[in-house]
C-alpha cells in the first residue's frame, strides 16, 4: 500500500548505492513497494538480481534495476549516471547508502585501509551527490531529494580504536550533508538534503569489520536488541513522504537499549 505523501514519487527514479544487502537492500525493497523505479548498485549484483526477482514475484508496483558499479572508481560512477540518463532520463532521489569499514586504527592502521574508507564513505558519496544534483538541474527537477545514510559514529566517537577512522569519515558525512543543504538553498532550489544516522543495525557490518574474529562480530549484535535494516528503510520512507516544504535535516536513531 502506498504511504500517504509517497504518491508524488510513483514511477520516478531513485538511486540506492550499496543495495546488495543490509540497509541498502531494505531501502531498495521499500521504495519498490511504494511504486518507484529503483536503480540499485553494488560491486556485485547477484543479490540485487535476486531481490529484483522477489519484488517482481511479490507484485510490487515499482521496479528494481540492478547495476554493477565500483564506487571507489569515479569512472564507474560517471558511467552509471550516464546510463541512467540515457535509459531512464535521470535521478530524482539519490540515497547514498554504501559504506565501508576497515579495522585500521589511528596509531597502527594501514594507509590503504584509510584510503578505502575515505574513497567510499566520503568521495563516492560526494561524487554521487554532485552527479545526482546535475541530473536534477538539467531536467528542471526542483523537488528531488538526496539522502545520506550516515551513522551515530558521525555524531560521537566510540571508544573502540578500530572504528576511529571510520568515525572520522562519518563526521565528514554530517558536515557534507549540512553543507549540501546550504548550497541547495543558495542555488534557490527546493531539492532537499537529509542525513539518517542509525546506531547499531544488525547487518554484515560487524562481520566485515572483525573479519578475523567472527566471534567478536557476533557478540556485537547479541548484547542488545539491534535496529533492523527495515527500521532504517522506514525512516527513509518517512523522510520522502513529508511535504515538499518540510526539510528533515537529520534523523538520529538507535536501539532503545544502546547507551551511546
From Swiss-Prot:
UniProt keyword annotations, A-Z: Lipid metabolism, NADP, Nucleotide-binding, Oxidoreductase, Secreted, Signal, Steroid metabolism
GO BP: estrogen biosynthetic process
Pfam families: adh_short (PF00106)
Active-site annotation: 166
Cellular localisation: Secreted
Record text on activity regulation: Inhibited by flavonoids including apigenin, luteolin, genistein, kaempferol and quercetin and also by carbenoxolone, zearalenone, glycyrrhetinic, curcumin and flufenamic acid.
Family: Belongs to the short-chain dehydrogenases/reductases (SDR) family.
Assembly and binders: Homotetramer.
Protein name, as recorded: Dehydrogenase/reductase SDR family member 11
Amino acid at each position: 500500500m502506498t504511504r500517504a505523501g509517497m504518491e508524488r514519487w510513483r514511477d520516478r527514479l531513485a538511486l540506492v548505492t550499496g543495495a546488495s544487502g543490509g540497509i541498502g537492500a531494505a531501502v531498495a525493497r521499500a521504495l519498490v513497494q511504494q511504486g518507484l523505479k529503483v536503480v540499485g548498485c553494488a560491486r556485485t549484483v547477484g543479490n540485487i538480481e535476486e531481490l529484483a526477482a522477489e519484488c517482481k514475484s511479490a507484485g510490487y508496483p515499482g521496479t528494481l534495476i540492478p547495476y554493477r558499479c565500483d564506487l571507489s572508481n569515479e569512472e564507474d560512477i560517471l558511467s552509471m549516471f550516464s546510463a541512467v540518463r540515457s535509459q531512464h532520463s535521470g535521478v530524482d532521489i539519490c540515497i547514498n547508502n554504501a559504506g565501508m569499514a576497515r579495522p585500521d586504527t589511528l596509531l597502527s592502521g594501514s594507509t590503504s585501509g584509510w584510503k578505502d574508507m575515505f574513497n567510499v564513505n566520503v568521495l563516492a558519496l560526494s561524487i554521487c551527490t554532485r552527479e545526482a544534483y546535475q541530473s536534477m538541474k538539467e531536467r528542471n527537477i526542483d523537488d528531488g531529494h538526496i539522502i545520506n545514510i550516515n551513522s551515530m559514529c558521525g555524531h560521537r566517537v566510540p571508544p573502540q580504536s578500530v572504528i576511529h577512522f571510520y568515525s572520522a569519515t562519518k563526521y565528514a558525512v554530517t558536515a557534507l550533508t549540512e553543507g549540501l543543504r546550504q548550497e541547495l538553498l543558495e542555488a534557490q532550489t527546493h531539492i532537499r538534503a537529509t542525513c539518517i544516522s542509525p546506531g547499531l543495525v544488525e547487518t554484515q557490518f560487524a562481520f566485515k569489520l572483525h573479519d578475523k574474529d567472527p566471534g567478536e562480530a557476533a557478540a556485537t549484535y547479541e548484547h542488545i536488541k539491534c535496529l533492523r535494516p527495515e527500521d532504517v528503510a522506514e525512516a527513509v520512507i518517512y523522510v520522502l513522504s513529508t511535504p515538499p516544504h518540510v526539510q528533515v535535516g537529520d534523523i538520529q536513531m538507535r536501539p532503545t537499549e544502546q547507551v551511546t
